[in-house]
Structure formats: C-alpha cells, structure tokens
Amino acid sequence: MSRINANDLNLTDRVVHISRVAKVVKGGRRFSFSALVVVGDASGHVGYGLGKANEVPEAIRKGVEQAKKNLIKVPVNQNQSIPYEIIGRFGAGRILMKPASPGTGVIAGGAARAIFEAAGISNILSKCLGSNNPHNVVKAAFEGLRLLKTPEELTARRGLAE
C-alpha cells in the first residue's frame, strides 16, 4: 500500500487525550506530557499519532507530525457511513462499528468520535467493548477502519466482477 502524502490534503487535528506522566528522580518528580492526536481531512483520510514532550503544545505538535506519517484511506459510502459492520481490535480494546442510515449521526464515545469525525464519517453506530483506555480505543478503531474494503474491492477479490 502506498503512503499517503499529507501535504496534498487539507488536514485538521483533534487532541483526543493528554496525560501527565512523572519520572521520579533523586530531586523529586520530573513531569512530562503525552498527547494522543487524530488528524483527518473529513473525506476519508485519517491518522493518529502520539507525541511526548516536556510542554503540552510541543507534545501536540509532535503528535500531529506522527499522525501525518500514519494516514490511511477509509472507504466512506454515499450515506457518509462505512460499507459494512466490523470489529476493530487492539490489545484489550475492541470496538464494534456499524453502518447507519442517513440522519443518524455519530453515536460513539469521545476517543472513537474523534476518529470518525476526522475521517468524514457522519453516520455510524459504535460501541467500545473491553478496554475504554483512549489509546486502545483509537488504535482499535483505526485498525478496524484500515481493514475495511470497498464493495468493488470485495467483489473483485471474490471473483464476482461482472
């Protein structure tokens, strides 16, 4: 699969989660921050990244850079939904994603909602099964969306092409 060039896309970023972590040293605690960021162009391209730094803005910037290197293309149908139901898995995190009819909206938790909105999916039903950790939810949703194929790809793969 060829790499998607982020410079050709009009990407917007959303911070999903910021956490403060502490390293215990002889003189006390040294704090730093990690930021989980999702980027997307609202027309099928989405990526996520994790940035770590001593300051929050720098961690977000690093997360955005990482996310731009980690872009995938999601097949979004004419209903602004996914073509079929799928379960994304990562670690203990599992997320069930179901296509929805027009007008349903994004029915998803915070971390998954960010990915769907960044990808331009505006009608979807989802449920987090297992871990609710934002890192696992984002990675599971991303993995599920990465495995989606268009109906044309499926018919060609099954040898049903007309």
Swiss-Prot record:
Origin superkingdom: Bacteria
GO MF, any single term: structural constituent of ribosome
GO biological process: translation
GO cellular component: small ribosomal subunit
Positions of the S5 DRBM domain: 11-74
Gene3D superfamilies recorded: 3.30.160.20, 3.30.230.10
Record InterPro entries: Ribosomal_Su5_D2-typ_SF, Ribosomal_uS5, Ribosomal_uS5_bac-type, Ribosomal_uS5_C, Ribosomal_uS5_N, Ribosomal_uS5_N_CS, Ribsml_uS5_D2-typ_fold_subgr
Keywords carried by this UniProt record: Ribonucleoprotein, Ribosomal protein, RNA-binding, rRNA-binding
Pfam families xref list: Ribosomal_S5, Ribosomal_S5_C
Cited function: With S4 and S12 plays an important role in translational accuracy.
HAMAP family hit by this protein: Ribosomal_uS5_B
Domain notes: The N-terminal domain interacts with the head of the 30S subunit; the C-terminal domain interacts with the body and contacts protein S4. The interaction surface between S4 and S5 is involved in control of translational fidelity.
Subunit structure of this chain's protein: Part of the 30S ribosomal subunit. Contacts proteins S4 and S8.
Family in the record: Belongs to the universal ribosomal protein uS5 family.
Protein name as it appears in the record: Small ribosomal subunit protein uS5
Organism annotation: Trichlorobacter lovleyi (strain ATCC BAA-1151 / DSM 17278 / SZ)
